[in-house]
């Protein structure tokens, strides 16, 4: 999977838009970061993943999930896109989208 593929499906969701963060491509919802591409052009910085869940993900699939010391104290997991499939990325991205999108948009999504 590539960031462009992630971008294509995420931009179909209401309130998602292209942006940049730390000089890299990013996806934003109402000006808040949904996810961004790391400088290595292969890792997705996935926000909204609690540390205990991150540990479980890494333990179960270390070829896909990882983190660096920089992210140790944050609810973030890194996803190696070259090893990931949409079925891995989309649920985490959608969950974080739900926390950033307006209540109205989330309600409309749930009702559709």
What residues fall within each predicted segment?
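Charge-dense, helix-prone N-terminal extensions
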Residues: 1-112
């Amino acid at each position: 999977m590539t960031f462009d593929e992630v971008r294509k499906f995420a931009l179909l969701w209401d309130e998602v838009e292209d942006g940049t963060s730390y000089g890299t491509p990013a996806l934003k919802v109402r000006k808040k970061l949904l996810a961004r591409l790391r400088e290595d052009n292969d890792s997705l910085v996935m926000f909204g993943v609690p540390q205990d869940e991150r540990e479980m993900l890494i333990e179960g699939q270390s070829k896909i999930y990882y983190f660096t010391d920089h992210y140790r104290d944050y609810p973030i997991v890194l996803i190696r896109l070259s090893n990931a499939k949409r079925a891995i990325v989309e649920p985490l991205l959608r969950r974080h989208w739900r926390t950033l999108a307006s209540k109205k948009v989330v309600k409309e999504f749930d009702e559709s």
